[in-house]
Amino acid sequence: MEKLNTGLDSNSRKAVADALNGVLADTYVLYQKTHAYHWNVTGPQFHTLHVMFEEQYREMWAALDEIAERVRAIGHFAPASGKAFADLAAIDSADAKPPAAAQMIKNLLEGHETLIRRAREALDIAGEANDAASEDLLTVRIQTHEKTAWMLRSMTE
């Protein structure tokens, strides 16, 4: 942990960093799952899902950097190994064998909903710490994952 004089006390920064690292881990696992599904999707909806999954994993890839850099900006370190991400994540990693396309959609929907809940918890922690920058980042993450969840949910109806 670095010494900072930015108006956030060290305990608050630690709590926010821990919460952000949880969101980061879930984002990383969901990114990997989405990317694997992009590679392995088959069936009549192949092209639609292949393109959609690519848009989703590219968006999450960019978000990973933003979240990790926020953790660094408040004086803490981001997880740096697959094991660390797996230990922190609430989302299950990609399946050993690719599921059918319909199950991929359901699995991703569940992952996005889990991530939304996790980001809301982190948002509350950032709010208690008066960390407006982390609140802004988390608000955008919630909005993005809610929109993606809506689109995935619409494909299951």
In which residue ranges do the predicted regions lie?
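Internal glycine-rich alpha/beta core junctions
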Residues: E2, N21, A73-F77, D87
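Disorder-to-helix initiation segments
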Residues: E2-V23, A101
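Helix-loop segments that flank and shape redox-cofactor active sites
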Residues: L8-A15, L30-E55, A122-A133
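Amphipathic alpha-helix face/heptad-repeat signature
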Residues: V16-D26, L30, Q56, M104, ...
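A structural signal for well-ordered alpha-helices, especially hydrophobic packing surfaces
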Residues: L24, Y31, H38, Y57, ...
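Conserved alpha-helical segments that form or flank metal/cofactor-binding pockets of metalloenzymes
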Residues: V41, Q45-A84, M155
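Charged, amphipathic alpha-helical segments and their flanking helix caps
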Residues: H47, Y57-D65, I125-I142, E146-M151
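Acidic/histidine-rich alpha-helical segments that form the ligand environment
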Residues: E69, K83-V140
